[in-house]
Amino acid sequence: MEPKYQRILIKLSGEALAGDKGVGIDIPTVQSIAKEIAEVHNSGVQIALVIGGGNLWRGEPAAEAGMDRVQADYTGMLGTVMNALVMADSLQQYGVDTRVQTAIPMQTVAEPYVRGRALRHLEKDRIVVFGAGIGSPYFSTDTTAALRAAEIEAEAILMAKNGVDGVYNADPKKDANAVKFDELTHVEVIKRGLKIMDATASTISMDNDIDLVVFNMNETGNIKRVVLGEQIGTTVSNKASE
């Protein structure tokens, strides 16, 4: 079966790397995720990654506790680089040539983010892991994912969620009558105020015609199923469902 998408960006939360611990980095968990990503990559799909840093640091609570917000956000960016390096190492162990590019230069451990270089890596079948957000405070890793996806001309952003199998009209953990959407448009997401991504990220995705697929990453094989076009999770696009 031919993949639905040829070039994707996978957005992982930092907590996804923590496993059952909830904080820190659990290497077996990272290896499990890397194995699945490597299998999809080996099917011929070009892949980039953005990983959050919430397993190591959260800037907003630190700022609320009195820390300077800019410094708190920069600290969080460094956390995303740690996650990127660990994931890149695991991907390399599965035989996938991988590069880490950071928005804040730190050439001893990673390449600086250069769009043209990132595109060349993808064209040469390397996975690129983007770290340090966009290099500026006040911007989330969701916005980073949308911006980088637009820059590398990705067809879709795969929002891999922990235990969440899509987008609902209410919190399914609190409302037994919550209804899951199979398809939505970017406009509907913004109008309904659905908190899939922040508003900036949603707008970038809409303006650049990038599909957004929200799915449960805890089920093995789901990344491959999304890439092959199976109906799992929720797909957000500019096309209204028929």
Swiss-Prot record:
Q: Which residues form the signal peptide?
A: none
Q: Name one GO cellular component term.
A: cytoplasm
Q: Which compartments is it annotated to reside in? A: Cytoplasm
Q: What is its EC number?
A: 2.7.4.22
What the entry lists under CDD domains is as follows:
AAK_UMPK-PyrH-Ec (cd04254)
Q: Which InterPro entries match?
A: AceGlu_kinase-like_sf, Asp/Glu/Uridylate_kinase, Uridylate_kinase, Uridylate_kinase_bac
Q: Which GO terms describe its molecular function?
A: ATP binding; UMP kinase activity
Pathway given in the UniProt record = Pyrimidine metabolism; CTP biosynthesis via de novo pathway; UDP from UMP (UMPK route): step 1/1
**What regulates the activity here?**
Allosterically activated by GTP. Inhibited by UTP.
Q: Which UniProt keywords apply?
A: Allosteric enzyme, ATP-binding, Cytoplasm, Kinase, Nucleotide-binding, Pyrimidine biosynthesis, Transferase
> Which parts of the chain are coiled coil?
none
Q: Write down the superkingdom of origin.
A: Bacteria
Q: Where does UMP bind?
A: G53, D73, I134, G135, S136, P137, Y138, F139, S140, T141
Q: Where is this region: Involved in allosteric activation by GTP?
A: 19-24
Q: Name the Pfam families on file.
A: AA_kinase
Its family remark reads:
Belongs to the UMP kinase family.
Name used for this protein in its record: Uridylate kinase
> What organism is this sequence from?
Streptococcus agalactiae serotype III (strain NEM316)
Its organism's taxonomic lineage begins at: Bacteria, Bacillati, Bacillota, Bacilli, Lactobacillales
Q: Which gene encodes it?
A: pyrH
